[in-house]
């Protein structure tokens, strides 16, 4: 039987090396160039088809990656027999039962077995794309609105009076607050002969937990804060425990040890310790391993809880506040975030320290120092009204030896004006202080403050990747104001207050990077909360109005500054004519009254003459630089609104950060 021979040596279906391969697979001996089929004297002739050698196509070169010639040095012409390999001696039988001396060797590597796409990673990418789209939509929208307002204001003078209402709304509201505060002072101090609400002193002193959440604080910062708690006056008869919660185990720049190591090795007195691999369910939904230690710090009992992973300050607050609430309620057979072993362990330590019940939680930051009467003054304030569930102190700038630095003076004036105007109006008039700063607060342990409906379902909400930007902002920033707004919405009868006599000194940013990072969080967090408060149920009318005006003022900040510049130009050109206009004259009087009140804050809010001089020096600086600062903060906040990293304000050593975030347990 004869086989049909190809008509051409230039076949398009396979190369010469492939034909040799096919011969091996069929058990045939490849034809060697120059040898005919009948010249093999060692074997009888067979009826196998004979394939003549085919020359290479023009321009073809032998590939080093060929499966036949891989690993063989020198030229290997098509049709030649493959040499014996030194790597393998695997063989197989020919048709006649004889072993073949042909072999095949390879050095390929197989790719890893993994999914073609990671659902979590793709979801994160989609979330970032959505946030970026929302960010640019917001920027373009605000730029368009402000550009249109500026153009209309310059082009059409007929809309001046409408713009006056828009521009003066915030100033008029602030002037109204000033008048209410003055009238309140006049009624309570003059007409009522210095009447003050009666302090309701309980039969037994209230029992307190002093909460100190930490992250990457230094040895000096920790000892200053703890020592200020020890030095508190007039509360010696109040049973209390210092509750320290450290978020992760990291080192900040210049730190030789982590914050947990500073506390356990150098600051706190040694005591019994215990590790819980399953401590509680964190905000990310996974179980959080914690290390606990109990003992005494300068005579005051403490409970230390060190979290293995960083989950943010809000996670620490949810853990501590919810634990105190369920401890106070003696919760049984209810679903909580806590492992029962950890809950019992900490509860027993509270009882052994004399706290069979907890009335108040006093919160502070690890970079804050309390004045010696701070806690007592907050207790006095919260006793005045049983409806009050939370009190904040007066937060002052810690100048730390640099009494005339620009950053400290500027921020000191900001702090004083905020607390001396809107927060004071909320405390004295509405009873709804919408922000209890975490660096100085006293909160009643109650269903309205620390119940599951407030903490676990709303305050502790962890944003999903497909949530809108507002939800991401509120889930990461401004936890203090968001907590208060949730209380007002769910429990409209509750009130909060401010104790101006309760002084607390806090460290403020001293450079642009840290300052802008902090103000971005404050600006985005507060304005998002104000926006949500417009629509929240249970919010009183005056607070809704304040929130609405705050949102509008923030959105048209460039237009307001442009209008102010135009007003100065009009004054320069037609000053007499402007002053004869009663509308403009009334607006200027309202504006002047607002700034006069802010100036007078320097006479009654500071504690001594040095602080008064610092306030007035900062007031002048703030008056001329705040418009530029506001624009810079607005632009920076908008262009970084999709970045939810804490940046310089929570800076850690890179290697430590990687260790802390192992397993995807990072904050954001």
From Swiss-Prot:
Locations listed in the record: Cell membrane; Cell septum
Name of the protein this chain belongs to: Chitin synthase 8
GO MF annotation list: chitin synthase activity
Underlying gene: CHS8
Lineage, uppermost ranks: Eukaryota, Fungi, Dikarya, Ascomycota, Pezizomycotina
Primary role: Polymerizes chitin, a structural polymer of the cell wall and septum, by transferring the sugar moiety of UDP-GlcNAc to the non-reducing end of the growing chitin polymer. Participated in the development of cell wall and plays a critical role in fungal response to environmental stresses. Necessary for pathogenicity and deoxinivalenol (DON) production.
Family: Belongs to the chitin synthase family. Class VIII subfamily.
Enzyme Commission (EC) number: 2.4.1.16
One GO biological process term: chitin biosynthetic process
Species whose genome carries this gene: Gibberella zeae (strain ATCC MYA-4620 / CBS 123657 / FGSC 9075 / NRRL 31084 / PH-1)
